[in-house]
Curated annotation (Swiss-Prot):
The active site is at C116 (proton donor). The gene is murA1. This is UDP-N-acetylglucosamine 1-carboxyvinyltransferase 1. It comes from Streptococcus agalactiae serotype V (strain ATCC BAA-611 / 2603 V/R). One of its GO terms (biological process) is regulation of cell shape. One of its GO terms (molecular function) is UDP-N-acetylglucosamine 1-carboxyvinyltransferase activity. NCBIfam families: murA (TIGR01072), PRK09369.1 (NF006873), PRK12830.1 (NF009470). PANTHER family: UDP-N-ACETYLGLUCOSAMINE 1-CARBOXYVINYLTRANSFERASE (PTHR43783), UDP-N-ACETYLGLUCOSAMINE 1-CARBOXYVINYLTRANSFERASE 2 (PTHR43783:SF2). The modification 2-(S-cysteinyl)pyruvic acid O-phosphothioketal is found at C116. Pathway: Cell wall biogenesis; peptidoglycan biosynthesis. Belongs to the EPSP synthase family. MurA subfamily.
Length: 419
């Protein structure tokens, strides 16, 4: 069993660089299947989700070279082979293979996607879009088959009943080579959607409106290879900014796009966090007294659900009472009892997280229950007096590139051990 051990209470200082966006790259890699030549992705994070996607792609027949933060993907040999089991089941983002395989072959048979347990996250919106474009859906045991019965996908007008990043991206991928025009209304607006659309447009697709709530895709016959720089990970950036405010003695977070973090930064300003925003970095000063705030998550450009948990340890340092309401994923509260185990005055009440501070945390054995809860526990461990042991760390390694090395470079006493 692997665990992360932190001896907390150290003041951190220095500079940390943000890696490429996890939530982009997990869609960009499957999207390369649509190309008829090599696609090169730069800025790819060193995370286990990428490792799993590379394994899946190679099983399908892709030839992939990986050097540093660059992936060179030759999708020409990809075959439409059924993949009902294996890594495809443990990876939430595996659903993007439905869009790419439908777009290339008109069919796909894959195991149902996994990932973090954050409450209901059905793929109904994805299936509704695929059906509108002419695909049929059937179930074979624990896998699902989509097929167009030998016909190409057809452009369609698609209204998303709820705002969904995954369904918006999957529809864009599937529609890129469909016959005719596809219009997505009530589309999600996240930066990662723009990133995927940029890759596809550079491959020869005709996509307009990414980043707005109406996206139009004019299908094309073929897509070619290209080179693409993955955008910085706004969630990783927010995580390190929150950590810097909680325990830092002057930390510069680089490779940051401020415009992707405006709602998050606004809440830090409300708390009284002192920081300097530069062109592609944010310098976070050592903090004094912070004020408790209340937060409600919402789709972009609102406060990101993925930043709710990493921000929580910083909130615990603030004076006063506050609350967190996650309107996106109702079960994103599993970090609360773990923080309480460390001495935090925090609980759940009527579906809302409530807290009171300031708190002095103490090291304790805790368990990461999902990716962002794991990030919260790492920050809490850095803040706490004494030794913190975090188990179930595979969740953390899914989404934070070289996290041990990055924190060590700032002065943290943190290590990954195997027992």
């Amino acid at each position: 069993m692997r665990k992360i051990i932190i001896n907390g209470g150290k003041q951190l200082t220095g500079e940390v660089a943000v890696s490429g966006a996890k939530n982009s790259v997990v869609a960009l890699i499957p999207a390369t299947i649509l190309a008829d030549d090599v696609v090169v992705l730069d800025g790819v994070p060193a995370i286990s989700d990428v490792d799993s996607l590379v394994d899946i792609m190679e099983t399908m027949g892709a030839k992939i070279k990986r050097y540093g933060e660059t992936l060179e993907i030759d999708p020409c040999g990809v075959k439409d082979i059924p993949m009902p089991y294996g890594k495809i089941n443990s990876l939430r983002a595996s659903y993007y293979f439905y869009g790419s395989l439908l777009g290339r072959y008109g069919q796909a048979t894959l195991g149902l996607p996994g990932g973090c347990d954050l409450g209901p996250r059905p793929i109904d919106l994805h299936l509704k879009a695929f059906e509108a474009m002419g695909a049929s859906v059937s179930y074979e045991g624990d896998s699902m088959r989509l097929a167009t019965n030998g016909k190409p996908l057809q452009g369609a007008n698609i209204y998303m009943d709820t705002v969904s990043v995954g369904a918006t991206i999957n529809t864009i991928i599937a529609a890129a080579k469909a016959n005719g025009r596809t219009v997505i209304e009530n589309a999600a607006r996240e930066p990662e959607i723009i990133d995927v659309a940029t890759l596809l447009n550079n491959m020869g697709a005709h996509i307009r409106g990414a980043g707005t709530d109406v996206i139009t895709i004019e299908g094309v016959k073929s897509l070619h290879g290209t080179r693409h720089q993955v955008i910085p990970d706004r969630i990783e950036a927010g995580t390190y900014i929150a950590m810097a405010a909680a325990i830092g003695r002057g930390i510069k977070v680089t490779n940051v796009l401020y415009e992707h973090l405006e709602s998050f930064i606004a809440k830090l300003d409300e708390m009284g966090v002192r920081m300097t925003v530069e062109e592609d970095s944010i310098f976070v000063e050592e903090q004094e007294r912070l004020k408790a705030v209340s937060i409600k998550t919402s789709p972009y450009p609102g406060f990101a659900t993925d930043l709710q948990q990493p921000l929580t340890p910083l909130l615990l340092t603030a004076e006063g009472n506050g609350s967190l309401l996650d309107t996106i994923y109702e079960k994103r509260v599993n970090h609360v009892p773990e923080l309480a185990r460390m001495g935090a005055n925090i609980s759940t009440l009527g579906g809302k997280i409530v807290y009171s501070g300031p708190n002095q945390l103490s090291g304790a054995p805790v368990k990461a229950t999902d990716l962002r809860a794991g990030a919260a526990l790492v920050i809490a461990g850095l803040m706490a007096e004494g030794r913190t042991e975090i188990t179930n760390i595979e969740f953390i390694l899914r989404g934070y590139s070289n996290i041990i090395e990055k924190l060590t470079s700032l002065g943290a006493d943190i290590q990954l051990v195997e027992e």
